[in-house]
Amino acid sequence: MSDQKVFARYKANEIVTDLQHFGVKKFKSNITRRKNALRKIIANLVLGNYGEMSVLFSELLKFWQIEDDLEVKRICHEYIRVIGALKPQQAREALPFIMDDFKSRDEKLQIMALRTLVLVPVKELSDQAFDCIISLVNHKSPPEQVTRTAIYALLDLDEIDHERVLGLSSILHDIVKAQSSSPEVIVAALHTLYSIHEKNANMEPFRIPLELAFDMLELLPELNEWNKATVLEVLTTSVVPQHYLDTHEMIELALPYLQQVNTYVVLNSLKFIMYLLNYVDVIKETLAEKLSNSVIALLDKPPELQFLVLRNVILLLLSRESSLLRLDISYFFIEYNDPIYIKDTKLECLYLLANKETLPRILEELEQYATDIDIQMSRKSVRAIGNLAVKLDEDSVHDCVAVLLDLLEFGVDYVVQEIISVFRNILRKYPNNFKANVTELVKHTEVVQEPESKNAMIWIITQYSDVIPNYLELFRVFSSNMFSETLEVQFSILNSAIKFFIRSPTKETEELCMDLLKGCIDHENNPDLRDKTLMYWRLLSLTKTSRISNAITFESLKSVLDGELPLIEMNTKLDPTVLEELELNIGTIVSIYLKPVSHIFRLNKTKLLPQSPILNPNKDLLPVVGNSFPPTGANRDRQNSESQSSTKSRKTAMMDDYDKPAEKINQLKGKRKSSSNNPSKLSRKPSTLLRKLSMKRPFS
């Protein structure tokens, strides 16, 4: 039966015809028809047809009694999970059948039954779930998958009865500390304890002893990819180093997982290492290279993962005054087939990586993007050039302005408008450096059509009227159509007219000013514009009437309405507290938004660095050295000697991948050759083949 026929709303009596009371033999001979009817029930539950489907409860119980088919059992359990929350009495009636499945020898049935007990919010089922979990974790040799399910089920039961779950937490602690269970069960217990602490705001942050942290790190080779990532995530903020030597050893144990193919493992390893770097005295140069190479390797992932990585690159670039990552800017050059969200994020990375040395190559790229056929990309590239001019020092701004003036000659309307918009910010930062270019900008007065570019052009004409001979003529291009403009442009026109009159109270400026004031009062209905107009009118009337005791002079009025503007600055720094919290959430959705957790998930706990005698108050002062770390493990008495011997045996394991190509073993690619060394623009951007040919071993 097709999905289209299954996923349709049915009446209960329509499905009952397929579930009529036949004998057991009749049921056995009509399996397909019976299963299709059951599938229709689940499909209607998905569609929200609860009222009709709840009528079929008694029919479903009869199937439950006689059927051994796993799919039928799965449908029955799914039915109870959905209907049980709406009809608690039906869930109670189904409890004996659920327990029969739990007591069976089939692990899959046991897991189904346990999940049903946990997910139905009925007291009788929850009590039975607690009893089942206790019996499983206390059993001498329970099935591994069932035990894992039971441990993870405590997270759902925690929302129902937190105090009762806390009573079982000691059992989970024993599982983790004993290290006698299977690795998957140990990880499940560790993650459950961590999640319970994270979900409850009134509980202290989860902490584990240092020795247990080393045991978990040494257990990583035995785990699958997802469990590796889970352990690394839990260890972040849970283990608090007390000595530099311990920190360096944990970093060494976590470093190999930067080379994993699984992105989740790499990001959690990166997060764990970045966390530990808050508790070191020095940073090794090779560590910075390995971190950089792992990030570079992640840039070859699919676009969705690449976007996550790029957002985390922005976070890491913001984390220190001098970035720890050694990233060549060519990795962030935009490709024609990049999605728009990748292009935007790469532009942000280029902006953060820009300095005096990299600026020429970045400007060369941005100039090409600005002439691209993609209008949105072209605009953002021009905006990026303008932002770089404001961000960098005075020596670099001339290069940015030269590129903008070249693009101005390009003559495309949207490019010209964007250039005028960004030039306003440049003139705000350097008011006296580019007066000679103002006359070139105002030649394009007729081109500007968008509110932002109109505002920018009006501001430029007003601010530099002393170097524009026909400034009033240019201004009338905008003022003549004032009442058809947007509100923000109307404000700009009104402000500029007042400034012209205050600076030069001639008959021409007075007429212009009075016409606009009267027009705003007589023809405009916007209360904000009318209020501002009346305020200006009142101020001007006070300057003209000397008989009034509170009259003010033109000079006083000029200081209020036409004062000197402060220089603007581009601030790319985040609040240190917010930055600290974001670093502890690398690889999560918080790192995409670059906002505190509380702004995105209201109920989540804020992560902070645990206090320690070796916690660095200012990581910008950490030296990056080329010499090796102190010998790991020296002068440290490990409590578990068996763990030491197992670690040594793992380190001396024979290599079993000698017959595989090197590129299959090491998935990371090396630093791409710089494209700016070749003056030819045709071969300036490296192709995919060139990238592969320029690969080298990143961790050598």
Curated annotation (Swiss-Prot):
An example Gene Ontology CC term for this record: endocytic vesicle
Keyword Hydrolase: no
Keywords, sorted A to Z: Cell membrane, Coated pit, Endocytosis, Membrane, Phosphoprotein, Protein transport, Transport
Disordered, as annotated region: 625-700
GO molecular function, a single term: clathrin binding
Primary residence: membrane
InterPro entries, per database record: AP_beta, AP_complex_bsu_1_2_4, ARM-like, ARM-type_fold, Clathrin/coatomer_adapt-like_N
Name of protein: AP-2 complex subunit beta
A biological process from GO: vesicle-mediated transport
Composition skew (Basic and acidic residues), residue ranges: 653-663
Summary of the function given for this chain in its UniProt record: Adaptins are components of the adaptor complexes which link clathrin to receptors in coated vesicles. Clathrin-associated protein complexes are believed to interact with the cytoplasmic tails of membrane proteins, leading to their selection and concentration. Beta adaptin is a subunit of the plasma membrane adaptor.
Coiled coil: none
Modified residues (Phosphothreonine): T652
Transmembrane segments: none
Cellular compartment(s): Cell membrane; Membrane, Coated pit
Lipid bilayer topology: Peripheral membrane protein
SUPFAM superfamilies the record matches: ARM repeat (SSF48371)
Note: Present with 1670 molecules/cell in log phase SD medium.
Pfam family of the protein (one): Adaptin_N
